Amino acid sequence: MTATLERRESFSLWERFCSWITSTENRLYIGWFGVLMIPTLLTATSCYIIAFIAAPPVDIDGIREPVAGSLMYGNNIITGAVIPSSNAIGVHFYPIWEAASLDEWLYNGGPYQLIVLHFLLGVASYMGREWELSYRLGMRPWIFVAFSAPVAAASAVFLVYPIGQGSFSDGMPLGISGTFNFMLVFQAEHNILMHPFHMAGVAGVFGGSLFSAMHGSLVTSSLIRETSEIESANYGYKFGQEEETYNIVAAHGYFGRLIFQYASFNNSRALHFFLAAWPVVGIWLTALGVSTMAFNLNGFNFNQSVVDSQGRVINTWADIINRADLGMEVMHERNAHNFPLDLASNEVLPVAVNAPAVNG
C-alpha cells in the first residue's frame, strides 16, 4: 500500500482578499471598481447630507454676498441645496487643505467640489463595476454601455459645463429649486430649447417612456391561455410564476393590426435593443449638447428673422422665446453685474410686442 502526502496549498492574506473581492458568490458583488466606488460614494453621500442640513451660506458669485442653502439656515426640502463653489475660486481645485481655515473653505463652497468630484468618481466606478460583473459572468457588456448615458449627463452639468464657463459657480446646485434655477439660466444664456441635441434628448426620454409603457402593457396583456374558453384567461396563471406567460406572436399580431404591420417587432432581441438604444442615444446627445454649450456653441437663433417689405420685424415664436430669455438673464445674479451683456450689446428692444394697428 502506498500513501501519497500532498502539501496543502496556503494562500496569503492578499490572495484571499483578491479572491473575495472578485468572487461572484458574494451577496453583493464588490469587484476592483467597487473598491473605488464604495469610499467615493460614501464620502459624497455623507458630505451631501451634512452640507444640506448644516452648511453655512456660500459666496457663490464671489461678491461677498453669501447665499444660504442648508436647512438650518431657513430653507426647506424644496428650496434647500448645496451651493456651488464661489466664483472667486473659479475652476481651481479647492480641497480642504487649500483653504486657510475650515470656515474659509465652507464660505467659498468647498463642499460642492468635494461632493461632485467624489460623486462622479463613484458613478464612473459603478459603471465599471457593471462591466466587471458582466465579464466575470460571461455576459455581454451592454449594461454598462447603457449606464454611460446618465454618467455622461451628470459629467456634463457638474464638470464639463463649469470648466467651459470658467467657474464651478456655474455648475448645477445640488437641490430641487437650484436645479430649476440652473435650467432657467441655462436657457437664458444658451437657448438650449432651440438646440437639436436637446430636442433629441427630449425625444429619447419621452419616447423611451412611451415605448416602455407600450411594451410593458403588451407583455402584461399577452397571456398564453391555460384555461378553457368559458373561463377567464386570468385564472390560468399566478402573479410571479416562473413559467412563461408572454406570447410575442400574439403581441406582434395585436400591435401590427393596431398601427401597421412593420411598426411591430417579431424578434424579441431586436425589440429590447431598440428599447435600450432609443433613450440611451437621446441622453448621449443631450450630454453632448450641454458639453458644446459649455463653450458657448449655443442653440439656434432665429430672432428677428421674418420681416415685411418695409423691413419691419414680424415677431415669431423665436422672438417671444428671446424676450423670455432676456428676462431670465436680467433676473439671475442680480447683484453680480449692473447690466447683462446680452442687453447692453444690442439695440433697445420694447418690453412688449406691439400689436398691428387695425383700421376699423
From Swiss-Prot:
Q: Which Gene3D superfamilies match?
A: Photosystem II protein D1-like
For this protein, what post-translational modification is recorded in UniProt?
Answer: Tyr-161 forms a radical intermediate that is referred to as redox-active TyrZ, YZ or Y-Z. C-terminally processed by CTPA; processing is essential to allow assembly of the oxygen-evolving complex and thus photosynthetic growth.
Q: Site annotated as Tyrosine radical intermediate: where? A: 161
Q: List the disulfide bonds.
A: none
- Enumerate the residues binding pheophytin a: 126
For this protein, what does the record note about how its cofactor is bound? Answer: The D1/D2 heterodimer binds P680, chlorophylls that are the primary electron donor of PSII, and subsequent electron acceptors. It shares a non-heme iron and each subunit binds pheophytin, quinone, additional chlorophylls, carotenoids and lipids. D1 provides most of the ligands for the Mn4-Ca-O5 cluster of the oxygen-evolving complex (OEC). There is also a Cl(-1) ion associated with D1 and D2, which is required for oxygen evolution. The PSII complex binds additional chlorophylls, carotenoids and specific lipids.
The membrane-spanning stretches of this chain are 29-46, 118-133, 142-156, 197-218, 274-288
The top EC class is oxidoreductase
Q: State where chlorophyll a ChlzD1 binds.
A: 118
Catalysed transformations (reactions) = 2 a plastoquinone + 4 hnu + 2 H2O = 2 a plastoquinol + O2
What protein name is recorded for this chain? Photosystem II protein D1
**GO CC terms in record:** chloroplast thylakoid membrane; photosystem II
Which residues take part in binding Fe cation? Answer: 215, 272
Under the heading InterPro entries, the entry gives: D1/D2 (IPR055266), Photo_II_D1/D2_sf (IPR036854), Photo_RC_L/M (IPR000484), Photo_RC_L/M_CS (IPR055265), PSII_D1 (IPR005867)
Q: Which organism is it from?
A: Heterosigma akashiwo
UniProt keywords (A-Z) are: Calcium, Chlorophyll, Chloroplast, Chromophore, Electron transport, Herbicide resistance, Iron, Magnesium, Manganese, Membrane, Metal-binding, Oxidoreductase, Photosynthesis, Photosystem II, Plastid, Thylakoid, Transmembrane, Transmembrane helix, Transport
Residues that hold a quinone according to the record = 215, 264-265
- Membrane topology designation: Multi-pass membrane protein
Could you state one GO biological process linked to this protein? photosynthetic electron transport in photosystem II
Keyword Transport attached: yes
Residues binding [CaMn4O5] cluster, per UniProt = 170, 189, 332-333, 342, 344
Task: List locations, semicolon-separated.
Answer: Plastid, Chloroplast thylakoid membrane
Q: What else is known?
A: 2 of the reaction center chlorophylls (ChlD1 and ChlD2) are entirely coordinated by water.
* Self-association state and partner proteins as the record states: PSII is composed of 1 copy each of membrane proteins PsbA, PsbB, PsbC, PsbD, PsbE, PsbF, PsbH, PsbI, PsbJ, PsbK, PsbL, PsbM, PsbT, PsbX, PsbY, PsbZ, Psb30/Ycf12, at least 3 peripheral proteins of the oxygen-evolving complex and a large number of cofactors. It forms dimeric complexes.
Report the sequence similarity comment from the record. Answer: Belongs to the reaction center PufL/M/PsbA/D family.
Q: Which SUPFAM superfamilies match?
A: Bacterial photosystem II reaction centre, L and M subunits
NCBIfam families, per database record = psbA
